[in-house]
């Protein structure tokens, strides 16, 4: 069968039961072509991770966990149960990161429950930026690696070589940047710079004169992951404001009411913002590295 014929073959997403709910997020965009790669397993890994990194609060996580279990048990529509299963996994990541951040309804985790953060998001901005960039680098490199696999499947050897070299450049440049902050890594700075200088001419041979600019675009993609820190910081600041306004109220009942209303708003915003930004990072920065959209959903005339 010719490649152009394969591209018109209807597709079915087949994944293990625990991955199937995440097909819901993949189906929000046109399906991958028959010759492309199903991104569902990778969405199942990275989407909850990004969600938890952004929201990262024990109290919010438990509330979302209860909402997820309720949706799974009570919802009649399959799409709602799938959304509940996605939220269930994401809420667990939210609790885990909440422990790391020492946050439970904002800074109440530290003030009332004695939680000791491994990293304080309000004061450790630079480490959080580095962590976000590290996660982004891994995500982009995984996407490029899948692009190599996709190119080899399509017998596009030149494209596979280009993407492989791009991965090496990204890793080398990341190592060079890390060498300025880690004394041990400084020992390999020279060899890494030499490797980049050797790889660039080969990149031009395989991808044309604009190939280095294409690689630069990958670093632009990685910088986009700083939003994992920025949006998360906005969430914790809103929680802090809610607690302070509640504490400044003249009455206990007024304070409790204010706290409930503001934290409810923050939870709703905390579900919406991480979802949108996590999906954006997948759809724009990740899928573009390997997935060919345009697949037609297989709809059998009859099922047994």
Model-derived features: positions:
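Conserved, carboxylate-rich catalytic/transport cores that coordinate ions
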Residues: 1-304
């Amino acid at each position: 069968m010719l490649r152009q014929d394969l591209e018109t073959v209807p597709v079915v997403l087949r994944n293990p039961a625990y991955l199937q709910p995440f097909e819901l997020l993949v189906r929000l965009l046109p399906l991958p072509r028959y010759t492309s790669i199903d991104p569902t397993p990778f969405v199942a890994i990275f989407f909850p991770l990004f969600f938890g990194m952004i929201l990262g609060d024990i109290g919010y996580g438990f509330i979302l966990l209860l909402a997820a279990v309720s949706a799974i048990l009570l919802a009649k529509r399959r799409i709602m149960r799938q959304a509940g299963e996605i939220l269930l996994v994401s809420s667990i990541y939210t609790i885990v990161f909440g422990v790391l951040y020492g946050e439970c309804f904002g800074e109440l985790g530290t003030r009332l429950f004695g939680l000791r953060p491994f990293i304080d998001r309000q004061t450790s901005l630079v480490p959080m930026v580095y962590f976000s960039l590290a996660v982004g680098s891994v995500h982009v490199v995984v996407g490029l690696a899948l692009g190599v696999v996709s190119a080899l499947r399509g017998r596009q050897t030149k494209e596979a070589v280009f993407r492989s070299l791009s991965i090496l450049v990204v890793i080398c440049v990341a190592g060079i940047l890390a060498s300025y902050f880690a004394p041990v890594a400084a020992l390999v700075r020279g060899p890494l710079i030499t490797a980049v200088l050797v790889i660039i001419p080969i990149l031009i041979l395989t991808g044309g004169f604009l190939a280095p600019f294409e690689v630069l675009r990958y670093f632009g993609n990685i910088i986009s992951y700083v939003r994992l820190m920025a949006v998360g910081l906005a969430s914790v600041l809103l929680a802090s404001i809610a607690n302070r306004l509640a504490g400044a109220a003249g009455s206990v009942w007024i304070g409790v009411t204010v706290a409930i209303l503001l934290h409810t708003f923050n939870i709703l915003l905390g579900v919406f913002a991480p979802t949108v930004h996590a999906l954006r990072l997948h759809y724009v920065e990740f899928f573009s590295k390997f997935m060919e959209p345009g697949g037609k959903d297989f709809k059998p005339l009859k099922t047994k």
